[in-house]
A protein has these predicted regions:
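Alpha-helix-loop-beta-strand connector modules within alpha/beta enzyme cores
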Residues: 85-109, 141-148, 197-212, 257-279
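Catalytic alpha/beta core domains of metabolic enzymes, predominantly
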Residues: 36, 145-244
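N-terminal small/glycine-rich loop or linker at the start of catalytic domains
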Residues: 26-48, 77-79, 204-213
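Catalytic beta/alpha-barrel core
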Residues: 88, 103-115, 123-139, 147-159, ...
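N-terminal amphipathic alpha-helix/helix-capping segment at the start of soluble metabolic enzymes
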Residues: 2, 6-44, 269-271, 277-280
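Glycine-rich, proline-tolerant flexible connector loops at the mouths of alpha/beta enzymes
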Residues: 72-91, 246-256
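Active-site mouth loops of central-metabolism enzymes
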Residues: 41-58, 82-86, 106-110, 129-130, ...
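Hydrophobic faces of well-ordered beta-strands that scaffold small-molecule active sites
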Residues: 41-47, 69-73, 107-109, 126-128, ...
Length: 280
């Protein structure tokens, strides 16, 4: 255990803006009709990738009915293979913004390069993916604009490194940072990643920033997402980020870890029940 991490004086020295010591009350981030943090359960849902207007709108309609508070959709996809579908780019952003307006849901999409910022003008939340968690030039650029940033934990990032990345954004003047645990790389290969449930209470003790969990990337398999999602809420997470697709078998990206709308609806209902027990 790194006891230095839990020393308040050291925390204030290394993370003066992110440390809970500097901001004892948890941060609440308003995003359109939603609010992230505090007593608000956040349910982000939608396809891994925007594939077409028909696919996106069908999924958006379904997750809205199921209880989603924010619509997700990937448009610039940093894929492991250069031959994999990498998203629709600017056209995907246009469709995502249109779907957000149609179904009255704030939107979130991953940004991979600061040069793309003008294209994200109509997107409500900018996501920094695990691969870019330590892209400090990107973090600084995002800190100089006002949209909320959803900062995913890197594949092998420590708590300190994750906090430091948040500090990069905060230091540039943007106070709206949301942390998202999405699983880390470990020695086992039975799941896509290993969900670090301990990160939830630990990070909530260290920082005032909201902490969400992405059980889709942690599991890599749709059948395990509900269990991990329920566990995350029970551990104190402020919400979930879940991949949902109306036809996962035909998905162009990560279909194996996408829930059907009806399965997401059941997970959302379970999450609300658990949330109600923790926040009576």
């Amino acid at each position: 255990m790194n006891r230095h991490l839990y020393d308040e004086e050291a925390l204030m020295k290394d993370y003066p803006l992110a440390a809970r010591t500097a901001h004892p009350e948890g941060t609440v981030i308003p995003v359109g009709s939603a609010a992230i943090g505090g007593e608000n359960l956040t349910l982000i849902a939608g396809p891994c990738a925007v594939e077409s207007r028909e696919q996106l709108f069908a999924t958006a309609a379904a997750v809205k009915v199921a209880g989603a508070t924010i619509l997700r959709g990937g448009t610039y996809k940093p894929r492991t293979s250069p031959y994999a579908f990498a998203g629709l780019g600017e056209e995907g952003l246009r469709l995502l913004a249109e779907a957000g307006r149609e179904f009255q849901l704030p939107t979130v999409s991953e940004i991979t390069d600061a040069a793309l910022l003008p294209q994200f003008e109509e997107i409500d939340i900018l996501q920094v993916g695990a691969r870019n968690m330590q892209n400090y030039t990107l973090l600084q650029a995002l800190g100089r604009q006002s949209k909320p940033i959803l900062l995913k934990r890197g594949l092998a990032a420590t708590y300190e490194e994750w906090l430091a990345s948040a500090e990069y954004i905060l230091r540039e003047g943007n106070p709206h940072v949301i942390l998202c645990e999405r699983g880390i790389r470990s020695y086992q290969s039975g799941t896509r990643a290993t969900l670090d449930l301990a990160a939830i209470p630990v990070m909530q003790g260290l920082t005032h920033l909201p902490v969400l969990v992405d059980p889709s990337h942690a599991s890599g398999t749709a059948g395990w997402i509900p269990a991990l999602g329920r566990a995350a809420i029970a551990a104190g997470a402020g919400g979930l980020m879940v991949e949902v697709h109306t036809n996962p078998a035909q998905a162009l990206s990560d279909g194996e870890q996408a829930l059907l709308p009806q399965d997401f609806a059941r997970l959302a209902a379970d999450a609300h029940k658990i949330w109600g027990l923790l926040h009576p």
